[in-house]
């Protein structure tokens, strides 16, 4: 299981109810937002919004040059539109980096055989469009997005995988 949260990525390898390995990478969704802010020259808050509303883990050749219009509701100089393909390239590069680091770690520790039934990805970043596709490409294993248990309480909490 891989849990990609805002500030970190936690992972757990478990078979037959036995935990084989756990670990943490200090890379998470906030790093993707920082990359977007830097790469597209937009404020961090706007970068987070772009990631959530328009982000994808896969760069598509459909509609090359398509742009996303930005309202000018923030002070300072910023672009009025950004290239959708560039946004997706930034997201894809960071996610691919995370998955390659994890795959290298699993290979180094001899744990890939424990993952043959597949990988479950959870956390806020798991909601990124096409995340499953990039993970399957890197790991060469089946990947699924984990679902939140049906819990009582704040509605927003239940929407988080």
Spans of model-derived segments:
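Helical "lid/coupling" subdomains associated with nucleotide-phosphate turnover
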Residues: 1, 10-161
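Short, glycine/acidic-enriched loop or turn micro-motifs at the edges of active sites
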Residues: 6
């Amino acid at each position: 299981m891989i849990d990609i949260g805002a500030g970190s990525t936690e992972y757990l390898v478990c078979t037959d109810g036995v935990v084989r390995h756990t670990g943490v990478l200090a890379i998470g969704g906030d790093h993707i937002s920082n990359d977007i802010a830097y790469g597209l020259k937009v404020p961090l808050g706007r970068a987070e919004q772009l990631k959530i509303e328009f982000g994808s883990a896969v760069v598509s050749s459909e509609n090359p040059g398509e742009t996303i219009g930005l309202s000018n509701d923030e002070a300072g100089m910023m672009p009025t539109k950004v290239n959708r393909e560039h946004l997706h390239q930034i997201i894809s590069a960071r996610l691919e980096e995370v998955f390659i680091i994890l795959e290298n770690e699993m290979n180094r520790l001899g744990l890939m055989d424990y993952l043959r039934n597949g990988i479950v990805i959870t956390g806020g970043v798991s909601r990124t469009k096409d995340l499953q596709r990039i993970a399957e490409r890197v790991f060469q294993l089946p990947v699924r997005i984990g679902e939140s248990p049906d819990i009582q309480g704040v509605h927003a909490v239940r929407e988080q995988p």
